[in-house]
Swiss-Prot record:
One of its GO terms (biological process) is nitrate assimilation. Belongs to the nitrate reductase family. FAD binds at residues 706-709, 723-728, 735, 740-742, 793. The lineage of its organism: Eukaryota, Viridiplantae, Streptophyta, Embryophyta, Tracheophyta. It catalyses: nitrite + NAD(+) + H2O = nitrate + NADH + H(+). This is Nitrate reductase [NADH]. It is an enzyme of class 1 (oxidoreductase). The gene is NIA. Binds 1 FAD. Binds 1 heme group. The heme group is called cytochrome b-557. PROSITE patterns: CYTOCHROME_B5_1, CYTOCHROME_B5_2, FAD_FR, MOLYBDOPTERIN_EUK. InterPro entries: Cbr1-like_FAD-bd_dom, Cyt_B5-like_heme/steroid-bd, Cyt_B5-like_heme/steroid_sf, Cyt_B5_heme-BS, FAD-bd_FR_type, Flavoprot_Pyr_Nucl_cyt_Rdtase, FNR_nucleotide-bd, Ig_E-set.
Length: 911
């Protein structure tokens, strides 16, 4: 198990986007990725003027004269990485929040419910992309809603103890200052916090081990801005530089996110601190600070203020609430109450700036199974992971032990970056070690530790602190023998935790065993799960549902009802995160993101109890303390009195209804028709035409929700039908894992139940050409209906409703795009309608590639000429309806309809 240290080099890049110089280029032999990004077709930069030449990062060794072929090869690697990402979307989980306008990658693991948005990528996906993380997979830390910003209107003010206070526009930052561009690893100080929460709940939410990402940042050196404004001397009181964002947050009664660093740090050229406006060759995305943010290499992410508005040179540190009440490591004996009572938050020695040394095992991944057979035992197994340190310090050694620290093996290190002129390393590195499979079989765990150039190393045991920050104990993966197949044995690997509210991990198991061992046989009274007082005021679920607004916001947690109305303005997560759950049971989300202190605070707002027996959370079955207590018998007669009669409509807004799969038909190799029975035989689904439902299921221990539009008519009694395309694993290169929900549906046996929630959507067809869109009436005699792939189902639903009404003479012109003829859904039904009523229904198909000889429809993509030929010209009695993948809407439908003269803001309805 020989070890080596390899330094992969960056050298100066040639001028890149729009004349802005690039500052580094990777060696072609590096398997992990670097810079020199091609322009992005969907992120056009708002600045196109000639700019000052960049300040290049100086390196200690000579430049490596790579030729263009090597550079092009690297660019192709970057492009390949992008093709492996599914497109970002307007996530349904953001509906009803202030962030509903932002497109996000659906694979990001949400850690704080729906809002605010805090997330990390799956660890295996993060490592798959190597050195440079694609921006859509970069971890996100937001304290509240993302500000809506405009490049042209944005300014950054530099004020305080400077001779020439100024405001700079974005164009000035780009054009009047030299720029730097280089890769930086960003890490949240809460990385690996869930391990601490398994020992004792902190006041922070459950970060896993993927709150770390590396991207390429470009911006103006902070010291250049401060010099332009004439920063004052230390003698005149200029000791700190404060940064303030534009995001207004509830903390401290209402404040903006802000923090500060010492002026010596800000002016130190070796620290490479920049005011950044580009990431991975493109403008910043909304979640990462568009249009401008701070990048402070080697520091925790909490010091790098996003949506930067003000830079203030002061004598004192920042006065922001978040500068003091966040990003501190207090001694283990200090809990939140003691910290507040004795002002521990304000003691300067506990502030966090530079990252500490840390390392993580990423291969094997969690629940990976290594079969033990003649083939696997003849070759070594390669352990892999990442490591980083703060302050620009180089990670010099990573070691792995299989015997609890008795002996250690030194790993091979891969440093993809080259040190700066000052010998700094701003990025993570990767480690690997080959081990014998039989050695793994005889071991109980794998542990890793890293050491940096100052000989700092990771502690063996976890050191708890109230904020759960800077956790860097040995990362341990447990191993157990399993039997994956008949007659075969294997090793199953378990990571300590899984991020967010995901179940799994050896620490969770150990905690469960500890709790089980000390749990009393009878129910005890506690603050967080109080014994139900039979004299408390009792409310039915129907009464709670009425209180779903800012005027009266009630929530249910573990069967208790709380009035959160007077806490809206003080809630650290903002108003939206309460209102989105108002009138519902939010037990699962509350437990996932709140500390013991928050649970105690909640008691101040408790107003009563929910009338129920054997209470079960809407989202977390069997999570109540009431299930087997004597309270059930006390409430039984009450429940009988308040039970509501069977509803004629199945869907109940804000609630999930269980529906039973009663039939499944295979229409083609990847298309299925599913028939679900409603809870009662005399019910209709209750879905207005134009709206959709959510199917909800637990897949791989994680809640999965997807939107579908039934193909059955709205007046069907007792059931509804769905036509679903199954996206199988390993078929499409852009989506190697396939469709999570569609594959789950395909695997369901007859008789299985699935939760359904709805109705949802902003478009409702009311008949005879009348639509209700966002509460406003619209009318059309002619409909231009453009669909892509499974987007045909809402279009089909509207067509079905029109054709079923003999008095509805609305004309329909359908353009339906797919990859091949085999992908066309509901073709027989569409063709039948076009044949039966040719004066009112016209259907035209577009496929990317035809596999049938004599194909009489269009081949290629939806173009202006196709639309002009097959849909009506715009008029005051014509509307366009569209449903399809976001790129199709953005790049094919919107621009081509505009060329035809459609007002897409008023005359285009997108499902």
């Amino acid at each position: 198990m020989a070890a080596s240290v390899e330094n992969r080099q960056y050298t100066h890049l040639e001028p890149g986007l729009s004349g802005v110089g690039r500052t580094f280029k990777p060696r072609p032999d590096s398997p992990v990725r670097g810079c020199n990004f091609p322009p992005s077709s969907n992120h056009e930069l708002p600045f196109q003027k000639k700019q000052n030449p960049p300040i290049y990062l100086d390196y200690s060794s000579s430049e490596d004269e790579d030729d263009d072929d090597e550079k092009n090869e690297y660019v192709q690697m970057i492009k390949k990485g992008k093709t492996e990402l599914e497109p970002s979307i307007h996530d349904t989980r953001d509906e009803g929040t202030a962030d509903n306008w932002i497109e996000r990658n659906f694979s990001l693991i949400r850690l704080t419910g729906k809002h605010p948005f805090n997330s990390e990528p799956p660890l295996s996906r993060l490592m798959h992309h190597g050195f440079i993380t694609p921006v859509p997979l970069h971890y996100v830390r937001n304290h509240g809603p993302v500000p809506k910003a405009s490049w042209s209107d944005w300014t950054v003010e530099v004020t305080g103890l400077v001779k020439r206070p100024m405001k700079f526009t974005m164009d000035q930052l780009v054009n009047e200052f030299p720029s730097r561009e280089f890769p930086v690893t960003l890490v949240c100080a809460g990385n690996r916090r869930k391990e601490q929460n398994m020992v004792k709940q902190t006041i922070g939410f459950n970060w896993g081990a993927a709150a770390v990402s590396t991207t390429v940042w470009r911006g103006v050196p902070l010291r250049a801005l401060l010099k332009r404004c004439g920063v004052q001397s230390k003698k005149k009181g200029a000791l700190n530089v404060c940064f303030e964002g534009s995001d207004v947050l509830p903390g401290g009664g209402g404040s903006k996110y802000g923090t500060s660093i010492k002026k010596e740090f800000a002016m130190d050229p070796s620290r490479d601190i920049i005011v950044a406006y580009m990431q991975n060759g493109e403008m910043l995305s909304p979640d990462h600070g568009f249009p401008v943010r701070m990048i402070i290499p080697g520091f925790i992410g909490g010091r790098m203020v996003k949506w930067l508005k003000r830079i203030v040179v002061t004598t004192q540190e920042s006065e922001s609430y978040y500068h003091y009440k966040d990003n501190r490591v207090l001694p283990p004996h200090v809990d939140a109450e003691l910290a507040n009572a004795e002002a521990w938050w304000y003691k300067p020695e506990y502030i966090i700036n530079e990252l500490n040394i840390n390392s993580v095992i990423t291969t094997p991944c969690h629940e990976e199974i290594l079969p033990i057979n003649a083939w696997t035992t003849q070759r070594p197994y390669t352990l892999r992971g990442y490591a980083y340190s703060g302050g620009g310090k180089k990670v010099t050694r990573v070691e792995v032990t299989l015997d609890g620290g008795e002996t250690w093996s030194v790993c091979t290190l891969d440093h993809p970056e080259k040190p700066t002129k000052y010998g700094k390393y701003w990025c993570w590195c990767f480690w690997s070690l080959e081990v014998e499979v039989l050695d793994l079989l005889s071991a109980k765990e794998i542990a890793v530790r890293a050491t940096d150039e100052t000989l700092n190393t990771q502690p063996e045991k976890l050191i708890w602190n109230v904020m759960g920050m800077m956790n860097n104990c040995w990362f341990r993966v447990k191993m157990n023998v399993c039997k994956p197949h008949k007659g075969e044995i294997g090793i199953v690997f378990e990571h300590p935790t899984q991020p967010g509210n995901q179940s799994g991990g050896w620490m969770a198991k150990e905690r469960h065993l500890e709790i089980s061992a000390v749990a009393p046989p009878t129910l005890k009274k506690s603050i967080s799960t109080p014994f139900m007082n039979t004299a408390s005021k009792m409310y039915s679920m129907s009464e709670v549902r009425k209180h779903n607004s800012s005027d009266s916001a009630w929530i249910i947690v573990h069967g208790h009802i709380y009035d959160a109305s007077r806490f809206l303005k003080d809630h650290p997560g903002g108003v939206d995160s309460i209102l989105i759950n108002a009138g519902t049971d939010c037990t699962e989300e509350f437990d996932a993101i709140h500390s013991d202190k928050a649970k105690k605070l909640l008691e101040d707002f408790r107003i009563g109890e929910l009338i129920t027996t054997g209470y079960t959370s809407d989202s977390s079955p069997n999570s109540s303390v009431h299930g087997s207590s004597s309270i059930s018998s006390f409430l039984a007669p009450i429940k009988e009195l308040v039970q509501t009669p069977t509803r004629s409509v199945a869907l109940i807004p804000r609630e999930k209804i269980p529906c039973k799969l009663v039939d499944k038909q295979s229409i083609s190799h990847d298309v299925r028709k599913f028939k679900f029975a409603l809870p009662s035989e005399d019910q209709v689904l209750g879905l207005p035409v134009g709206k959709h439902i959510f199917l909800c299921a637990t897949v791989d221990d994680k809640l999965c929700m997807r939107a579908y539009t039934p193909t059955s008519t709205v007046d069907e009694v007792g059931f509804f039908e769905l036509v679903v395309k199954i996206y199988f694993k390993g078929v499409h290169p852009k989506f190697p894992n396939g469709g999570q929900m569609s594959q789950h549906l395909d695997s369901l046996p007859i008789g299985a139940f699935l939760d359904v929630k709805g109705p949802l959507g902003h478009i409702e067809y009311q008949g005879k050409g009348n639509f209700l869109v966002h509460g406003k009436q619209k009318f059309a005699k002619k409909l231009a209906m453009i669909a892509g792939g499974t987007g045909i189902t809402p279009v089909y639903q509207v067509m079905q409703s029109i054709l079923k009404d003999p008095e509805d003479d609305t004309e329909m012109y359908v353009v339906y795009a797919n990859r091949t003829e085999d992908d066309i859904l509901l073709k027989d039904e569409l063709d039948a309608w076009a044949e039966q009523v040719p004066n009112r229904v016209k259907v035209w198909y577009v496929v990317q590639e035809s596999i049938t000889q004599g194909w009489k429809y269009s081949t290629g993509f939806v173009t202006e000429s196709i639309l002009r030929e097959h849909i009506p010209e715009p008029s005051h009695t014509t509307l366009a309806l569209a449903c399809g993948p976001p790129p199709m809407i953005q790049f094919a439908i919107n621009p081509n309809l505009e060329k035809m003269g459609y007002d897409i803001k008023e005359e285009l309805l997108v499902f």
